[in-house]
Amino acid sequence: MLVPMRRVLVLLSLVLLVATPALADNVRGTRGNDNLVGTAGPDRINGLAGDDRLQGLGRNDLLVGGPGNDTLFGDAGNDTLRGGPGDDTLLGGAGSDRIAGGAGRDTIVGGNGDDRISARDGEVDRIACGKGRDQVVADGIDVVSRDCERVRRG
């Protein structure tokens, strides 16, 4: 079935976007487990509750996980990734990303670019930065990779 341009198809907690690259899309998930994929343009994707998988694809995306054990992929562009309560995996990809974990034991990978990573939640998080000049604000108990150039413990 072909989906007309700029339409959102919702089927069993699966959202598929098809749009022109120059336009931004705003997508909200459900209280269930969602698989939300953005477009080549800038997107705002909010997974809400559930164990969600969010992927931005291109441009400068905002991905918000919400409660649950979420996986967020920024891909290309200068993205903003925000975890939430739960054990999240946050992957920035190429570009200078802003990544913030939430309550839970998160795994954060900045990827290529000058990333800003925040992981101050009082639980053990694992952080890797990748290429670029990265800044990390982390708890004293967090495991921070040696490839993170500037690390501040709080």
Residue ranges and their predicted role:
Residues 1-8:
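Positively charged n-region of N-terminal signal peptides that target proteins for export
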Residues 20-26:
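Sec/Tat signal peptide C-region and signal peptidase I cleavage site
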